[in-house]
A protein has these predicted regions:
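Soluble, non-transmembrane catalytic domains of enzymes that act on hydrophobic metabolites at membranes
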Residues: 1-4, 253
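Juxtamembrane luminal stem/stalk of type II transmembrane Golgi/ER carbohydrate-processing enzymes
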Residues: 3-22
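Conserved catalytic core of two-metal-ion nucleotidyltransferases
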Residues: 20-43, 88-156, 164, 179, ...
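Active-site nucleotide-donor binding segment shared across nucleotidyl transfer reactions
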Residues: 39-72
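Catalytic metal-binding acidic patch
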Residues: 63-83, 152
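Functionally critical loop-and-helix segments that line ligand-binding/catalytic clefts
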Residues: 161
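Glycine-rich, aromatic-lined ligand/substrate-binding cores of catalytic
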Residues: 168-173
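His/Asp/Glu-enriched short active-site or ligand-binding loop at hydrolase and phosphoryl-transfer sites
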Residues: 175-177
Length: 253
């Protein structure tokens, strides 16, 4: 199925492909190559991005990719979405293809040589907080950055990366834990495939109410992390996000 992304360089067409957690363990050599190519092209057009989630965790804990990870996680700000969309043409020339691009301009997955990169596009939710697909994060982890050496290049990372990992993963963040069910049963794989197929193919009248409820649930999960972090700190470091503040982004690509 051919889908379209409107860019400043014309209409970018791509074929939607279903991917889901637990597909396979990443090939680190190819992933490293992909990351360095992405950085070179992003630097050429002035696109600012940083390492995120599992890739950031590996960078500060293993100083490498996490051995049991399956992809590269990067993030950009919503303000840079048009620069990123224009970059898709250059990425294609280097062998990358878009696998999925969320209709809310919040997630893009790129694949090259069988290895993929997830690009999380964070928009402002409320004061000091950003989110993509309901996944909230303190804005400082996306904007207050520092440069580190990683995989043969220099990459931006949250200046308080260790603090982010403590907030996101809890006190066990320094202990490697394989979370992906790479040996999942066939029916589990089919259910995962169905979930993501629905995510990208449901009509708007069904998709947006579903994502609104999903986002509200993720904000509740974020507030539980706030409670956990404050308990670890022994004081109130962060306040919870007010109930009812989540509103789904309906910006279309």
């Amino acid at each position: 199925m051919k889908l379209k992304i409107n860019t400043g360089r014309g209409v970018f067409q791509y074929k939607f492909q279903v991917i889901y957690e637990g597909v396979k363990v990443m090939n680190q050599e190819i992933s490293r190559e992909n990351l360095l190519i992405f950085k070179r092209l992003a630097d050429n057009v002035g696109l600012r991005f940083s390492l995120a989630y599992g890739t950031m965790l590996g960078a500060i804990r293993e100083h490498d990719f996490i051995p049991h990870d399956e992809d590269i996680d990067l993030c950009i700000l919503q303000e840079d979405i048009e620069t990123f969309k224009n970059l898709l043409w250059d990425l294609r020339e280097e062998g990358f293809e878009v696998m999925r691009f969320d209709r809310r301009n919040s997630l893009c997955s790129l694949i090259r040589k069988g290895e993929y990169i997830d690009i999380y596009i964070f928009r402002k939710l409320c004061e000091g907080v950003r989110e993509f697909n309901g996944e909230a994060i303190w804005e400082k982890y996306l904007t207050v950055l520092e440069e580190i050496d990683f995989q043969g290049g220099k990459f931006l990372i949250a200046k308080e990366a260790a603090d982010f990992c403590l907030f996101e993963y809890g006190e066990s963040w320094q202990t490697p834990i394989a979370m992906k069910p790479y040996d999942m049963a066939w029916y589990q794989k089919k259910l995962s495939q169905l979930f993501w197929w629905l995510h990208f193919n449901l009509p708007d009248c069904l998709f947006f109410p579903w994502m609104q409820r999903n986002g509200e649930g993720k904000i509740e999960a974020f507030n539980k992390k706030v409670d956990r972090y404050n308990k670890i700190a022994g004081k109130t470091v962060y306040d919870k996000i007010p109930e009812g503040i989540y509103h789904i982004a309906k910006t279309k690509k």
